[in-house]
A protein has these predicted regions:
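RecB-family 4Fe-4S metal-dependent nuclease core
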Residues: 1-254
């Protein structure tokens, strides 16, 4: 972990950004543990092939951009990385009610606006691509399948879901149930002036996801119910474009 669990100011972030050795060592360690499955804290680093060397340099470059952006966001705290959040929902089908656990892993949780009236948490989902989701007019647009390609609404669905769970169901990092903002942080956009990763609905940044909770969860449960409903045929989409980037396309032969 590069960043301490403390309120961050610009000076230590800039010092860290300039410390190429420390950043290199952290990336090397992460590659050894995550790519090669070596024990945590191992001091021996495997020799990398050409592609792996390129990936290492890209990661180092991305970290530099991220630290430069974080420097503009001070004061804030990084509360957690890779934090898992889940919530159980009651789903109704023609065969009755059942409980389903929904959630996943948050890339990063920040506390921003520390010590001010706008003090809140920010649920961050890192994105390495270049296509950012278009601002949505309403929560209903998040669940419109036609917006998956047009507006990348699937990114927004995940970020909002995690934020709702974080806002009310995390005694470790949000025991006071502070407001939570969902954010999609596109690494390649970090250099843009006035860039903000926080999602927008109807032209306004989401400063408290609870404002949208009721509508979102009703539509979420409705969508899940349709998936599990025995009377509704579960068939592949007729829109082949949806399948191009789908990680599950091998399951249906697409």
């Amino acid at each position: 972990n590069l960043l301490p669990e403390a309120i961050l100011s610009a000076e230590p972030l800039e010092r860290l950004r300039r410390n190429k050795t420390e950043i290199f060592d952290v990336v090397e360690q992460a590659i050894s543990e995550e790519l090669f499955n070596l024990p945590e804290g191992t001091k021996t680093h495997p020799e990398l092939n050409g592609l792996q060397l390129i990936i290492r340099e890209v990661i180092i470059k991305y970290l530099g951009k991220l630290l430069e952006y974080d420097k503009r966001m001070v004061p804030f705290m990084v509360l957690a990385h890779e934090s898992e959040v889940y919530k159980e929902y009651s789903i109704e089908t023609s065969e009755g009610m059942f409980q389903l656990k929904v959630g996943g892993r948050i890339d990063r949780i920040d506390e921003i606006g520390v010590g001010t009236s706008s003090d809140r948490l920010r649920v961050v989902d890192y994105k390495s691509g270049t296509v950012r989701p278009t601002d949505l007019k309403s929560i209903e647009e998040v669940f419109d399948v036609n917006n998956i390609l047009k507006k990348h609404s699937d990114y927004c669905l995940q970020a909002i879901l995690y934020s709702i769970i974080e806002s009310e169901n995390d005694k470790t990092y949000n025991p006071e149930q502070k407001p939570v903002s969902p954010a999609l942080l596109f690494i390649q956009s970090l250099g843009k002036k006035d860039y903000s990763p926080v999602l927008r609905i109807g032209g306004e940044e989401i400063t408290d996801v609870q404002r949208y909770k009721e509508d979102f969860e009703n539509l979420l449960k409705q969508t899940i119910s349709e998936i599990y409903e025995p009377k509704v045929p579960f068939t592949p989409t007729s829109e082949i474009k949806f399948c191009q980037m789908c990680p599950y396309r091998s399951l249906c032969g697409r």
